[in-house]
Amino acid sequence: MFHGYHFGEGILKNKILLVSALALAMGMNAAQAVEKSANAKTVEVVVNANDFPFSFVDDNNNITGYDGDLLKVLDQRLTDYTFHFNAVSRDAMIVGLSTGAYTLAADHFYLTKERAEKYDHSGEPTGISDLRLIVRNDENDIHNLGDLASGKKKLVPIHTSDARYTVIENYNKKHPGQQINLQPNGEQSAADIFKAVASGEYDAAIYPIGALLALNKALNLNLKASDSVGLFPNVYLYKKNTDPQLIKAIDAQLVALKKDGTLAELSRKWYAEDVYALPGASDVKVNTDWE
């Protein structure tokens, strides 16, 4: 089931929306769905309604994207749980998770110490973010985070609840003499972030390359990406004191979906790259060692 609002932007029409109509290679057809228990518990699941290609609501009012498709696979595979889908803004997701309105939130979240203290989280990655610096094609001075700092380049502001903010914040802590100008901002879609770089308003953005690969040609932005800044595990966030059996059941399915290639297929479908084939991907784990 799905509760949310209709979302339709021009950038998600035409060829991009054709992607959401493709059948998944694994785990998505009715024949593979398990029969639900008569006592299956309903889980309130929430995704971001406007975060292509991670999750969004298409012109037919369907939740889709990497997170949307993965949650549908999980819902079909879980015997003792059934998902009720919600799609809202990122801020509303966090509020609803904090108040207990939602049990599980999916928005390619990175795990931070603050999030681990405030919420429960999956013990297995739901995906991998290949984080890059996104710059204009004619920008030849930015190749890494150090170039942002030494060149006093303008970085697109980042929402403080986004772990990309923490990545830059941690860099600044380790380099007190060479700081990146980090500014907070409200919610922005990937398209808006990339447009801010393409227009020259900012020099660079830090963002998963999958979103750039999915949007660059469609929006004719003439952007390119640096080498990888790092591979980061994505996690589900759960409301505090969530039934540990639910988390355990979903973690077990995530392991199985990685093993059978479903996660790699979703990555190719939505990010235009198989993040699981990247060097170091096999070593990406959910880490709670904050030191």
Write out the residue ranges for each language-model feature:
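Extracytoplasmic small-molecule ligand-binding "clamshell" domains
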Residues: V34-F109, G186, I250, D260
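Periplasmic-binding protein-like
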Residues: N48-N50, G127-R132, D138, K217-V255, ...
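Bilobed "Venus flytrap"/periplasmic-binding protein-like clamshell domains
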Residues: A49-F52, N60-Q76, R132-Q179, Q183-S189, ...
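Extended ligand-binding regions for polar small-molecule ligands
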Residues: G68-L78, E139, G146-D162, Y236-Y276
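Acidic, polar ligand-binding/catalytic clefts
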Residues: K72, H84-A149, L223
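Ligand-binding clefts/hinges and TM-proximal coupling segments of bilobed small-molecule sensing domains
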Residues: T82-H84, S161-L182, V255-E291
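Short helix-initiation/N-cap motifs at beta->coil->alpha
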Residues: H84-V95, H143, I180-K195, L231-F232
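A ligand-binding cleft/hinge motif common to bilobed small-molecule-binding domains
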Residues: A92-V95, A106-K118, V167-N170, K195-L231
